[in-house]
Amino acid sequence: MKVVVKKKDNSIPLEITTEFIKLQDAMKYANVVYSGGEAKVLIQEGQVQVNGEVCTMRGRKLRPGDTFTFDGSVYAITEKP
């Protein structure tokens, strides 16, 4: 008997119209922070993951296909058609 397990994608899509978006801007766009200053602190404290790894660079460029995780929620960067 063959068992196939598929990971359910529960990510929240964030559509962008540009080539990339900076991590702190993506956090503001997703309404997970109120200001860039708040995003800066959370990122520098290591509370944000990009593509499954802790990221402390607030200027990190996220492109379509990238994800960031904060407070248990996963946000997927997608390209607006």
Region spans (language model):
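Ferredoxin-like alpha/beta domains used as RNA- or RNAP-binding modules
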Residues: 1-30, 54-81
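Generic non-transmembrane alpha-helix signal with a bias for helix starts/N-cap capping motifs
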Residues: 20, 35-36
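Short, well-ordered loop/turn sites that connect or cap secondary structure elements
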Residues: 33, 42-43, 62
